[in-house]
């Protein structure tokens, strides 16, 4: 499923990569001003990221976080509230190694990971140390991730 999300002036198409035809259509038909966020388990992710950048799109990866209401992305272990901080950090690094040329991550919504300072802090530090952006889709207000970005 592809969701188009607008936050302020920025519009993003998220969850790209699960459906090849829809992903291709988004890259080819959406204007370059629209940022695209790809699922990290997308087959041949580096090729898709390059194609999107060639068409003028700013690219993000979706941050895989545990979602009790739905299945995890195949082959990608999500960041979890029950995992040790070092394990979540390793999972984040694995996701980061899936492609290059992206500018950051999109957190798909409120989760245990985004609500806990203890869980979010080492992840946020890793992203900040690498100069990567983080966009959180959070209709419920302020989260731990938000608080940590303003520290």
What is each model feature region?
Residues 1-151:
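Catalytic-site microenvironment of enzymes
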């Amino acid at each position: 499923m592809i969701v188009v999300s607008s936050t302020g002036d920025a519009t993003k198409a998220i969850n790209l990569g699960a459906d090849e035809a829809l992903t291709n259509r988004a890259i080819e038909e959406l204007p370059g001003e629209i940022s695209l966020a790809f699922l990290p388990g997308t087959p041949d992710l580096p090729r898709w990221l390059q194609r999107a950048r060639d068409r003028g799109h700013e690219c993000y990866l979706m941050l895989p976080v545990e979602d009790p209401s739905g299945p995890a992305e195949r082959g990608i272990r999500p960041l979890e509230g029950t995992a040790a901080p070092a394990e979540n950090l390793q999972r984040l690094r694995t996701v980061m190694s899936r492609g290059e040329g992206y500018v950051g991550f999109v957190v798909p919504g409120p989760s245990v990971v985004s609500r806990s300072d203890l869980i979010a802090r080492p992840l946020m530090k890793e992203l900040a140390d690498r100069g990567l952006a983080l966009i959180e889709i959070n209709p419920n207000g302020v989260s731990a991730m938000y608080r940590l970005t303003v520290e």
